[in-house]
């Protein structure tokens, strides 16, 4: 790995997790990243100094908290090159995707096409399957042909009847990415009234995303995948579409008025989609996290380091005689593979004994449920060359040695 400005050793010093879990290696970062210390500290700070409800807008403490919430919205908008009023707080990316599907239910008609690919995460399948069934829309599940990319498959699948295109920017299982900007430009030309949804959960830690340039309508990610707090999702909805969508949840502070005939007049902007009390503690912690990362680290350098990790991991795994990679078009350091002689469940147990955290199974991808079991290694910026070399050494362990380790 060539010398770069980003220093993973320095970055690791911002995570007490490594002190508290000495000798452990976390290679399951696509499931949840380790949270920065500033996130834990901010969580404690919120409960000790704030812990009030922002729906009460008069007290001074509440006003400070409201300002922090709106500042966080602004920080996210700048990070993604979006408008502040296009950033909506949810509980997770899963909720965001359900929010999108429910909101679009009045805009997707019978025989409209909904396109998604066959190996999507379940959270990005079920809402659209349900929408297609309820609205009698045509659900088009696309497959990738040999020697062609997913981008090519999406471009080929688009027609003037396509109403909704659902894209996972980066696969949680295979680590390959899709050129959603290219697809968006193509689709909007042949079907101007179509909508594009992007699941960016795995892309956000590894790619710079420009929502405005990409001309997408909906996007989501979860903060716990990028060193942030759990229980918080970020949903982007293009401002000009918000008035056309039904809110997924109904409750306090989302409406302007309710007349005698129970007709609801909703508020404009994010408030329409943020019923009830938000996860204020998580938003507060995210605010501190974003400011800390902007001050201390250059995201472009982090993206470059991510590429270096991916290249090294691919080199080590692809050259290992015991390992069969599921694919060879990874764009980020997420790898699914099988061992030639040891099943994935046993291999995961063996690595756990050696204090390496990995993921085993179909990894929430419905296509492989009860069919194939992979072992997944997913890396983030605190992972190191030394950790990968240790993994390589273990994966070269003989079959008999692994079996003996499991038995005894």
UniProtKB/Swiss-Prot annotation:
Pfam family, one: Aminotran_5
InterPro entries named in the record: Aminotrans_V_dom, Aminotrans_V_PyrdxlP_BS, PyrdxlP-dep_Trfase, PyrdxlP-dep_Trfase_major, PyrdxlP-dep_Trfase_small
Enzyme class: transferase
Signal peptide per UniProt: none
Gene Ontology molecular function: cysteine desulfurase activity
Keyword annotations from UniProtKB, A to Z: Pyridoxal phosphate, Transferase
Enzyme Commission code(s) on record: 2.8.1.7
Catalytic activity: (sulfur carrier)-H + L-cysteine = (sulfur carrier)-SH + L-alanine
Cofactor section: pyridoxal 5'-phosphate
Domain of life: Bacteria
N6-(pyridoxal phosphate)lysine PTM positions: 225
Entry's family note: Belongs to the class-V pyridoxal-phosphate-dependent aminotransferase family. Csd subfamily.
PANTHER family the UniProt entry points to: CYSTEINE DESULFURASE, CYSTEINE DESULFURASE 1, CHLOROPLASTIC
Its biological purpose: Catalyzes the removal of elemental sulfur and selenium atoms from L-cysteine, L-cystine, L-selenocysteine, and L-selenocystine to produce L-alanine.
Protein name, entry field: Probable cysteine desulfurase
Source organism: Mycoplasma genitalium (strain ATCC 33530 / DSM 19775 / NCTC 10195 / G37)
Name of the gene encoding the protein in the UniProt record: csd
């Amino acid at each position: 790995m060539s010398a770069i400005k980003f220093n993973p050793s320095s970055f690791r010093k911002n995570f007490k997790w490594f002190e508290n879990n000495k000798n452990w290696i976390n290679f399951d970062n696509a499931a949840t990243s380790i949270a920065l210390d500033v996130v834990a500290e901010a969580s404690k700070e919120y409960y000790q100094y704030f812990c009030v409800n922002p729906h009460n807008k008069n007290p001074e403490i509440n006003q400070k908290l409201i300002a922090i919430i709106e500042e966080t919205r602004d920080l996210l908008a700048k990070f993604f090159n979006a408008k502040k009023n296009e950033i909506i707080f949810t509980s997770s990316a899963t909720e965001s995707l359900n929010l999108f599907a429910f909101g679009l239910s009045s805009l997707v008609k019978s025989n409209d096409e909904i396109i998604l690919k066959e190996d999507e995460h379940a959270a990005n399948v079920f809402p659209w399957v349900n929408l297609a069934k309820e609205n009698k829309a045509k659900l088009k599940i696309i497959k990738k042909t040999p020697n062609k990319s997913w981008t090519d498959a999406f471009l080929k699948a688009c027609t003037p009847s396509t109403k909704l295109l659902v894209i996972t920017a980066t696969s949680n299982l295979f680590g390959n990415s899709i050129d959603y900007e290219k697809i968006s430009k193509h689709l909007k030309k042949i079907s101007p009234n179509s909508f594009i949804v992007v699941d960016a959960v795995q892309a956000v830690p590894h790619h710079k995303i420009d929502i405005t340039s990409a001309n997408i309508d909906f996007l989501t990610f979860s903060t716990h995948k990028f060193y942030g707090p759990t229980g918080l999702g970020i949903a982007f909805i293009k401002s000009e579409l918000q008035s056309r969508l039904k809110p997924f949840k109904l409750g306090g502070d989302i409406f302007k008025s309710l007349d005698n005939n129970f007709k609801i007049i909703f508020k404009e902007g994010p408030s329409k989609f943020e019923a009830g009390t938000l996860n204020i503690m998580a938003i507060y912690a995210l605010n501190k996290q974003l400011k800390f990362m902007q001050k201390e680290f250059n995201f472009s350098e982090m993206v470059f380091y991510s590429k270096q990790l991916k290249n090294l991991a691919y080199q080590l795994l692809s050259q290992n005689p015991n390992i069969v990679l599921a694919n060879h078009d990874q764009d980020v350091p997420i790898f699914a593979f099988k061992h030639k002689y040891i099943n994935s469940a046993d291999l995961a147990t063996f690595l756990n004994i050696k204090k390496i955290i990995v993921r085993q199974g179909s990894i929430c991808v419905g296509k492989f449920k009860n069919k194939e079991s992979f072992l997944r290694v997913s890396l983030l910026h605190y992972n190191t060359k030394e950790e990968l070399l240790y993994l390589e050494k273990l994966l070269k362990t003989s079959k008999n040695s692994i079996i003996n380790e499991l038995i005894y």
